[in-house]
From Swiss-Prot:
Record's function text: NDH-1 shuttles electrons from NADH, via FMN and iron-sulfur (Fe-S) centers, to quinones in the respiratory chain. The immediate electron acceptor for the enzyme in this species is believed to be ubiquinone. Couples the redox reaction to proton translocation (for every two electrons transferred, four hydrogen ions are translocated across the cytoplasmic membrane), and thus conserves the redox energy in a proton gradient.
Pfam family, one: Oxidored_q2
Keyword annotations: Cell inner membrane, Cell membrane, Membrane, NAD, Quinone, Translocase, Transmembrane, Transmembrane helix, Transport, Ubiquinone
Protein name per its UniProtKB record: NADH-quinone oxidoreductase subunit K
Coiled coil: none
Gene that specifies this protein: nuoK
Organism whose genome encodes this protein: Nitrosospira multiformis (strain ATCC 25196 / NCIMB 11849 / C 71)
E.C. number(s) listed in UniProt: 7.1.1.-
Length: 102
């Protein structure tokens, strides 16, 4: 089985990270913003795995496990906050967050 070259894996990670960043900057729906953050975290994890496999080290896979645990915590807290925002303001628009200021 032929290995995927390192620059191909890093290019894919960079493209995924850019798509996540564009999703954060363009979309106003908080669920899509949360999904874009998840895409960015997975892109960073992919970069770690690709770099670790290039140097035949397990460090990249260990870092990916840490990234997955951080992503799981981020999703649970983020969805709980989104649920509270939706109950209070009846919208998931990011501009509604500015109404929380006193």
């Amino acid at each position: 089985m032929a290995a995927i070259p390192m620059h191909h894996g890093l290019l894919l990670a960079a493209i995924l990270f850019a798509l996540g960043m564009i999703g954060i900057l363009v979309r106003r729906n908080l669920i899509f913003i949360l999904m874009s953050i998840e895409i960015m975290l997975n892109a960073a994890g992919l970069a770690f795995v690709v770099a670790g496999s290039h140097w035949t080290q397990a460090d990249g896979q260990v870092m990916f496990i840490f990234i997955l645990s951080v992503a799981a915590a981020e999703v649970s807290v983020g969805l709980a906050l989104l649920l509270l925002l939706h109950r209070r303001f009846q919208t998931l628009d990011a501009d509604a967050v500015s109404k929380m200021r006193g």
